[in-house]
Amino acid sequence: MGVKCFFDISIGGKPAGRIVFALFDDVPKTVENFRALCTGEKGFGYKGSKFHRIIPGFMCQGGDFTAGNGTGGKSIYGSKFEDENFNHKHSKPMMLSMANAGKNTNGSQFFITTAVTSWLDGKHVVFGEVESGEDVVKDMEAVGSSSGKTSQEVLITDCGQL
């Protein structure tokens, strides 16, 4: 694992800590998209965007920096890009995976699993995992609900590459 990226998170306007992601080498196109959206080097990205959907015991979803509600976002390659491969599985909590609207519809939205979610294998591209900051993810999970609506705003206040 080569590339590492981070999110600094606030919950309800208060700093909640840092999540560090270790990204997998065998999904280079997916990793490069996430990395560039963390640094903002293309003029757009994750900084200042929120986690719009958090379901306890399942996952925390973010990455819609255009609409903020799960309908938007875009990749560095244009609007959408293909599923690179399904080498990695949703085999444990704290996996980082691409959200999508079906086959080959990756943009910028992603999710962090908080449980084993093996029914997503072969449908969503897993491209990294949480290396540190599991406690921050758990704090985020605590403000989620079964509908996915958060009781407090969960924001990426800063992000980048380490």
From Swiss-Prot:
Activity regulation text: Binds cyclosporin A (CsA). CsA mediates some of its effects via an inhibitory action on PPIase.
GO biological process terms, semicolon-separated: protein folding
Chain ranges of the PPIase cyclophilin-type domain: 6-161
Enzyme class, broadest EC rank: isomerase
Localization of this protein: Cytoplasm
EC number per UniProt: 5.2.1.8
GO cellular component: cytoplasm
GO molecular function: cyclosporin A binding; peptidyl-prolyl cis-trans isomerase activity
UniProt keyword list: Cytoplasm, Isomerase, Rotamase
InterPro entries from the UniProt entry: Cyclophilin-like_dom_sf (IPR029000), Cyclophilin-type_PPIase (IPR024936), Cyclophilin-type_PPIase_CS (IPR020892), Cyclophilin-type_PPIase_dom (IPR002130)
PROSITE patterns cross-referenced by the UniProt entry: CSA_PPIASE_1, CSA_PPIASE_2
Positions in coiled-coil regions: none
Highest taxon of the lineage: Eukaryota
Catalytic reaction equation(s): [protein]-peptidylproline (omega=180) = [protein]-peptidylproline (omega=0)
Entry function: PPIases accelerate the folding of proteins. It catalyzes the cis-trans isomerization of proline imidic peptide bonds in oligopeptides.
Recorded family membership: Belongs to the cyclophilin-type PPIase family. PPIase A subfamily.
Protein name as it appears in the record: Peptidyl-prolyl cis-trans isomerase
Gene designation: CYP-1
